Design a protein with these regions (language model features):
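A conserved mid-protein helix/loop that constitutes part of the nucleotide-sugar donor-binding site
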Residues: 17-22, 207-230, 247-253
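Carbohydrate-associated surface elements
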Residues: 163, 185
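Nucleotide-activated donor-binding/catalytic signature segment of Leloir-type glycosyltransferases, i.e.
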Residues: 253-269
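Aromatic "clamp/platform" in nucleotide-sugar-dependent glycosyltransferases that forms part
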Residues: 270, 289
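Short acidic/histidine- and often glycine-rich active-site loop of Leloir-type glycosyltransferases
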Residues: 298-299, 312-322, 326-327
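Short hydrophobic beta-strand element within catalytic cores of glycosyltransferases
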Residues: 306-309
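Conserved acidic donor-binding segment of nucleotide-sugar-dependent glycosyltransferases
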Residues: 321-322, 326-332, 341-346
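A short, well-ordered alpha-helix in the C-terminal region of glycosyltransferases
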Residues: 334, 341, 347-362
Length: 373
């Protein structure tokens, strides 16, 4: 049995956290003894873990050090102004403040959080392992500037899509030989099972659209709301439901009010089980501005839903326009045009659904990549 250590930020309610849990659940228990080291105490999704995992909370010798760790990522404009030496001394200092002792030499150690954070530096300098890998979850790799020194200690740098790997290699070509794709895995049968659970669905007798994701600028809800405003003016009989929470909730609800869409665009909040809502919608829409690998698109494909996504590089790895779903340019007008087209041509959506049923998703080759780090 191999000793596997994974360092992550938390088990909170984000896409990368879901991806982490799904990866752990997919690993054969007879092959891996897993230790999960967490930076934060947010364990909202811990109930999703199906197996016994040794969970360790990182502790620090001072409140000051712990507070510094909360600055786990910096905006790109800040990164451009600060020298790399600043981050090296910053991360080295915090790593020396960790009070946990990891004496074991692990077979594999994974920095699953990535994002150019303290986690990447900590695993590189304080964990002994035969093989090390770090994960990249987004197409915007600017923050990796802060951990370039530590990337040399990793055997693999995994991007969750080819788009992520390509963006990273353009920015940091000297690490090209270490970079490879490792797609996020999900338990398809579990998603199907959960989609059948009883849930009070507030859908009306009209064209029901669902979007799942955090209420943040990245996820493009503002674009969706503006697209909904266009659809309303075109007399389309629809209702759009957003599932998720986030820092932009108040701002987005104000935009809904400004556009007089209280009856057409409804925020349902976070849902432990969003799959019944997805299963019963007429169209699943993902209007993201950028993504690493869109897990909700994988879930929508697993449920064989009619799908419309913004035309971003990582989405193109999953969606072939007109084959297994549809893509639209990242604008309210383009999104509204494509939704109106699908509303008026349901047979086109049925065609993509049939394709999804005939071409199930297979993740079996992804897990083998851990053996080849």
């Amino acid at each position: 049995m191999k000793e596997l250590l994974i360092v992550a930020k938390s088990l909170g309610g984000g896409g990368s956290e879901v991806a982490l849990i799904e990866l752990i659940n997919a690993l054969p228990e007879e092959l891996y003894n897993i230790t999960l080291v967490l930076l934060d105490s947010d364990n909202e999704y811990a109930y999703r873990l199906k197996k016994n995992v040794n969970i360790v909370q990182l502790t620090f010798n001072s409140y000051f050090a712990k507070s510094l760790v909360s600055m786990y990522a910096f905006p790109a404009k800040v990164l451009k102004k600060l020298s790399v030496n600043y981050f090296i001394s910053y991360y080295d200092f915090i790593a020396n403040c960790v009070t946990n002792v990891f004496e074991k030499t692990y077979d594999i150690a994974i920095d699953f959080y990535g994002y150019g954070s303290f986690v990447t530096a900590f695993l590189a300098t304080k964990i002994q392992a035969k093989k090390k890998a770090t994960w990249l979850h987004d197409e915007k790799p600017y923050w990796m500037k802060s951990v370039q020194k530590y990337l040399g200690k990793y055997d693999k740098i995994y991007g969750v899509s080819q788009a992520v790997v390509d963006a990273f290699c353009r920015e940091y070509p000297h690490f090209k030989d270490k970079a490879a794709v490792f797609y996020n895995v999900i338990d398809i049968e579990e998603i199907k099972r959960k989609s059948e659970q009883d849930e009070v669905i507030p859908f009306q007798d009209n064209f029901n659209i669902v979007t799942v994701g955090r209420l943040t600028e990245q996820k493009g809800y503002d674009i969706a709301i503006k697209a909904a405003s266009i659809l309303k003016k075109r007399k389309i009989n629809f209702a759009w439901y957003g599932i998720g929470g986030g820092r932009d909730e108040k701002k987005l609800k104000k935009l809904v009010e400004k556009c007089c869409l209280e009856n057409q665009f409804v925020f349902l909040g976070r849902k432990k089980n969003p799959y019944p809502y997805m299963k019963h919608c007429n169209l699943y829409v993902q209007p993201s501005r950028h993504e690493g690998y869109v897990i909700t698109l994988v879930e929508a494909r697993a449920l064989c839903l009619p799908i419309l996504s913004s035309d971003i590089p990582s989405a193109r790895e999953q969606i072939q326009d007109g084959v297994n779903g549809y893509v639209a340019d990242l604008s309210a007008e383009a999104l509204a045009d494509k939704i109106e087209y699908l509303y008026n041509n349901p047979s086109q959506m049925e065609k993509t659904v049939e394709y999804l049923k005939e071409h199930p998703i297979d993740f079996s080759t992804e897990l083998l990549k851990l053996e080849n780090i």
